[in-house]
A protein has these predicted regions:
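Bacterial N-terminal signal peptides
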Residues: 9-19
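Bacterial N-terminal signal peptides that target proteins for export
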Residues: 1-10
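Core of compact, soluble alpha-helical bundle domains
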Residues: 22-146
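Low-complexity, Gly/Pro
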Residues: 3, 19-22
Length: 146
C-alpha cells in the first residue's frame, strides 16, 4: 500500500497539470482581436472596394440596406472562418458571385485592397498570411473570367 501512494500522488499531480498542456493556441479570430476588429477590417475593406473605380460596377445601384446586409455577411463569414462564434448564413460564394463577370484582374485588385486594409490595422505577418490563405480558397468560386 505504501508503494502505491507515491504512484497515485504522482498520477494526480500529472493529471492536474494536463489541462495546461492541453491548451490550444488562440484561434485566428482571437488573434485578430475578435468581432469588433473583424467588423472594423470589413468596414475598411468594403469602403476601399466601393470607392475603387475598378469595382464601381459591382457596388453601383445598391441600396444602403443591401450594402449593410453584404457587410454583415462578410463579417459573419470572416468571423466563422477564423474560429469565431458567428454563423455565416449567406449564399455559397459561387452562387453569390455567379454572373458578375469577376476577372483575375478584379481578384488581384481586391486582394491588394485587402492587404492595404490589413496593413492599416497593423495585422501581424502571421495572421495576415492566414487571412490571405483563407481568402485565396474562395478564388475558384468567385473568379469567372481570366
Amino acid at each position: 500500500m505504501k508503494i502505491r501512494t507515491p504512484v497515485v500522488a504522482a498520477a494526480l499531480y500529472l493529471a492536474a497539470a494536463l489541462p495546461a498542456f492541453a491548451q490550444q493556441a488562440p484561434s485566428l479570430y482571437k488573434r485578430l482581436g475578435g468581432y469588433d476588429a473583424i467588423a472594423a477590417v470589413t468596414d475598411d475593406f468594403l469602403g476601399r472596394l466601393s470607392t475603387d473605380t475598378q469595382f464601381s460596377r459591382f457596388f453601383g445601384g445598391h441600396s444602403a440596406d443591401s450594402i449593410k446586409q453584404l457587410r454583415q455577411h462578410v463579417v459573419d463569414q470572416l468571423c466563422a472562418a477564423t474560429g469565431g462564434p458567428c454563423v455565416y448564413t449567406g449564399r455559397p460564394m459561387k452562387t453569390s458571385h455567379a454572373g458578375l463577370g469577376i476577372t483575375e484582374k478584379d481578384w488581384d485588385a481586391s486582394v491588394k485592397d485587402l492587404v492595404a486594409t490589413l496593413d492599416k490595422f497593423s495585422v501581424p505577418a502571421k495572421e495576415k498570411d492566414e487571412v490571405l490563405t483563407m481568402v485565396s480558397t474562395l478564388k475558384k468560386d468567385i473568379v469567372e473570367k481570366p
